Amino acid sequence: MQNDFIIALAWPEGMVSACGSWYDVFFAKNKKYRVGHSALVLVESVTGNLRYFDFGRYHTPKDFGRVRDVKTDGDVTIKTIAKIEKNQITNLKEILLEIKKKESFHGEGTLYASILNDVSYSKAYKYAKKIQKNGLIPYGPFVYNGTNCSRFVASVMRSSSPTYIKNARLKFPICVSPSPKRNVGIANANFYRVTEKAFIEVKRNWFESYFKSIERS
């Protein structure tokens, strides 16, 4: 029975340095992209344990990235334990506020988050660790055998055995490549907006979740 969760995270406002690829001349502005950052938290329903994963150019050679979790980077630990009742995370606000305040996650601006329900923690964890064991991985959204933060998050969510429709949307996003905002929108129509002063739940219908950006909802 799959009754675990994945919390999809997005900081869309962050600026990322261009990686020196052929497409930079078309999309980068002043050698920067406004693509933000994407990450995820695996939630094990039995124990309430939380495991953060992301992918990025953290102390790596140029054009390469790596997968982070608590085993490789102790400062990405999440101390809060998830409280789960009736297949719902009841202390989500506490979890997201801890994430929002933690500088080691490298998130800039407003944090957006949503919950992917009824998935397999063990499958997602094994897949993320498998990618991590590859060590240095070519960085970029269109690089052969490479990845970036959004592609990594989408692939881990797919590995957790979500519903057929969500798996298809993650594999074939409307945009050219997975994005932080799109990952949050696919995981769940409803999402959370977290700032320094506010924690807001935004509820959307099926149509809005497909065609309306979380920043405009």
Task: Give residue spans per PLM region.
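An almost-null, non-specific background feature
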Residues: 16-18, 42-44, 59-64, 101, ...
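Extracellular-facing segments of soluble proteins and assemblies that are Gly/Ser/Thr-biased and enriched
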Residues: 78-130, 134, 138
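N-terminal, helix-rich and Lys/Arg-enriched segments in bacterial and organellar proteins
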Residues: 11, 20, 36, 116-120, ...
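Glycine-rich catalytic cores of cysteine/serine-nucleophile enzymes that process amide/ester linkages
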Residues: 4-101
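Activation targets extended, charge/polar-rich intrinsically disordered C-terminal tails
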Residues: 112-116, 125-217
